[in-house]
Amino acid sequence: MPTGTVARAWVLVLALWGAVAGGQNITARIGEPLMLSCKGAPKKPTQKLEWKLNTGRTEAWKVLSPQGDPWDSVARILPNGSLLLPAIGIVDEGTFRCRATNRLGKEVKSNYRVRVYQIPGKPEIVNPASELTANVPNKVGTCVSEGSYPAGTLSWHLDGKPLIPDGKGTVVKEETRRHPETGLFTLRSELTVTPAQGGTTPTYSCSFSLGLPRRRPLNTAPIQPRVREPLPPEGIQLLVEPEGGTVAPGGTVTLTCAISAQPPPQIHWIKDGTPLPLAPSPVLLLPEVGHEDEGIYSCVATHPSHGPQESPPVNIRVTETGDEGQAAGSVDGSGLGTLALALGILGGLGIAALLIGAILWRKRQPRLEERKAPESQEDEEERAELNQSEEAEMPENGAGGP
């Protein structure tokens, strides 16, 4: 065994002996050598001693003797009776016992409870916030520590003082994971706060503590996000597709609640005055719409600093294809229908008048022919008389000539 390794082991033993003298608890850093002394062991061979250990490497008590065995690479007994662990690990945590018989035949026992530790790297705040909004919850950042054993704890500080989570204005979400191969821990702590209006610029930091005596916490670099006043929300609008809210059975209706506010408010939906049991979302999708989906819909935007705000309602109706066309142009359709009805009535009256006129004309036609026949005969008689008078005058005119 190299001299340097033995020297470091003895230094560790001397450093820990003060803690062991009063009690039998020892803490050792992972990967470092550890030496445990056996009280009462004879300084000269042959000594009578026995080491027993119950650790993560054993299912029960393991007995070691000075003669050595295959466990020499893990733990072996030195000539002076001490037990050396060249590189202690997590699996070496447990109980170690030594029983020795001195020259006077008196039996002396030594008991040790060994714990190991590993100091992680310096913690850091990932995804730190550069700006916070007053009166609303804000995520400050996530404090991360990697490679610790045991797990340890993460703590947040505000302006140098411990920040105690209260579940309201200060919320901390913690997560602890253990590496399946090394057994070391990774800790994550997410801080969410609700800063007040008009306050000073806060300073946040995070620290890691292993929970061992004489071990100082490891601190992150501080962050100073500025606090701004929340923007009041603008008017809320409810958009519906298809436009007008009228859809055929089996169609799809999409309702979108539009509001401009920072941070974005939570959107809840109401139908016929009753809140719908849905998760907050700015979009409400109604697929395969049926008559049971008909009703008055509206959305409510809840902003932490400004209270709830409800949108104008929208009426969703389910109609057949023909009814849908009629409903889509209800004003124009009714006017055109009235005009068509009036034209139809007038056209019918005109046709009826023509038919009556034709019938009456046909009835009067024979009478007119009867009246015309006598008039023609009288004309012929008058014409004959005129011809005769003209013929009588012609001879008279001839007889009176020179």
UniProtKB/Swiss-Prot annotation:
Gene that this polypeptide is encoded by: Ager
Record organism: Rattus norvegicus
Compartments, as annotated in UniProt: Cell membrane; Cell projection, Phagocytic cup; Early endosome; Nucleus
Spans within the Extracellular topological domain: 23-341
GO biological process: astrocyte activation; astrocyte development; cell surface receptor signaling pathway via JAK-STAT; cellular response to amyloid-beta; cellular response to fatty acid; cellular response to glucose stimulus; cellular response to hydrogen peroxide; cellular response to xenobiotic stimulus
Induction field: Up-regulated in periinfarct ventricular myocardium.
Subunit structure, interactors included: Constitutive homodimer; disulfide-linked. Forms homooligomers. Interacts with S100A1 and APP. Interacts with S100B, S100A12 and S100A14. Interacts with TIRAP. Interacts with HMGB1. Interacts with LGP2; this interaction plays an important role in AGER-mediated pro-inflammatory responses and cytokine release. Interacts with double-strand break repair protein MRE11 which is a core component of the MRN complex; the interaction enhances MRE11 endonuclease activity and promotes DNA repair.
Keywords (A to Z) from UniProt: Cell membrane, Cell projection, Disulfide bond, DNA damage, DNA repair, DNA replication, DNA-binding, Endosome, Glycoprotein, Immunoglobulin domain, Inflammatory response, Membrane, Nucleus, Phagocytosis, Phosphoprotein, Receptor, Repeat, RNA-binding, Signal, Transmembrane, Transmembrane helix, Ubl conjugation
Glycosylation sites: N25, N80
PROSITE patterns: IG_LIKE, IG_MHC
Main location: membrane
Domain Ig-like C2-type: 123-219, 233-315
Modified positions (Phosphoserine) in chain numbering: S376, S389
Disulfide topology: C38-C98, C143-C206
Protein function: Cell surface pattern recognition receptor that senses endogenous stress signals with a broad ligand repertoire including advanced glycation end products, S100 proteins, high-mobility group box 1 protein/HMGB1, amyloid beta/APP oligomers, nucleic acids, histones, phospholipids and glycosaminoglycans. Advanced glycosylation end products are nonenzymatically glycosylated proteins which accumulate in vascular tissue in aging and at an accelerated rate in diabetes.
Signal peptide (UniProt feature, chain positions): 1-22
Annotated ranges, domain Ig-like V-type: 23-109
Protein name, UniProt field: Advanced glycosylation end product-specific receptor
Segments passing through the bilayer: 342-362
Tissue specificity annotation: Endothelial cells and cardiomyocytes. Expressed in brain.
A GO term, aspect molecular function: laminin receptor activity
Family annotation (InterPro entries): CD80_C2-set, Ig-like_dom, Ig-like_dom_sf, Ig-like_fold, Ig/MHC_CS, Ig_sub, Ig_sub2, Surface_Rcpt/Adhesion_Mol
Post-translational modifications reported in the UniProt record: Phosphorylated on its cytoplasmic domain by PKCzeta/PRKCZ upon ligand binding. Phosphorylated by ATM following DNA damage.
Any one cellular-component term (Gene Ontology): axon
Positions of the UniProt region annotated as Disordered: 368-402
Chain ranges on the Cytoplasmic side, renumbered to this chain: 363-402
